């Protein structure tokens, strides 16, 4: 077993690197406790969901560096990074996390803006005359 488990999670344009070591359950995101970084309860729960589902929230200290995107993308990236770290530590957790679809990278990205349109799909207002 490795001392430090290093994994990467991505969502939209966010990239999270998680470093997991055995410990007391502290989660640090960009040098801040997770409660301070993800102030929204839902985003925090989304990020910590793999730990809660596998019931290993108090077993590891996790340090996470996350950059890019917004809060939603970052919490998704953190969730994937933690899930991958848990599977690297314990293969039996893989089955649980896979059934909850926490090991799948969400492929949805923002659609690019097209020329001749206001946004990706929205057209300019049509004027008949």
From Swiss-Prot:
GO terms for molecular function: RNA binding; structural constituent of ribosome. Keywords: Ribonucleoprotein, Ribosomal protein. Signal peptide: none annotated. NCBIfam families: PRK00132.1. It comes from the Bacteria. GO terms for cellular component: cytoplasm; small ribosomal subunit. SUPFAM superfamilies: Ribosomal protein S5 domain 2-like. It comes from Pelodictyon phaeoclathratiforme (strain DSM 5477 / BU-1). The keyword Ribonucleoprotein applies. Belongs to the universal ribosomal protein uS9 family. InterPro entries: Ribosomal_Su5_D2-typ_SF (IPR020568), Ribosomal_uS9 (IPR000754), Ribosomal_uS9_bac/plastid (IPR023035), Ribosomal_uS9_CS (IPR020574), Ribsml_uS5_D2-typ_fold_subgr (IPR014721). This is Small ribosomal subunit protein uS9. The lineage of its organism: Bacteria, Pseudomonadati, Chlorobiota, Chlorobiia, Chlorobiales. Pfam families: Ribosomal_S9 (PF00380). GO terms for biological process: translation.
């Amino acid at each position: 077993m490795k001392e430090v488990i290093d994994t990467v999670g991505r969502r939209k344009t966010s990239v999270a690197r998680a470093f997991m070591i055995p410990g007391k359950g502290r989660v640090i995101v960009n040098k801040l406790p997770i409660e301070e970084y993800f102030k929204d309860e839902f985003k925090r729960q989304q990020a910590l969901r793999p730990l809660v589902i596998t019931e290993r929230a108090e077993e590891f200290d996790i340090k996470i560096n996350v950059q890019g995107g917004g809060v939603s993308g970052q919490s998704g990236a953190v969730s994937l990074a933690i899930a991958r770290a848990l599977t690297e530590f314990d293969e039996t957790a893989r089955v649980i996390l896979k059934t909850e679809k926490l090991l799948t990278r969400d492929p949805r990205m923002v659609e690019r803006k097209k020329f001749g349109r206001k946004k990706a799909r929205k057209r300019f207002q049509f004027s008949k005359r």
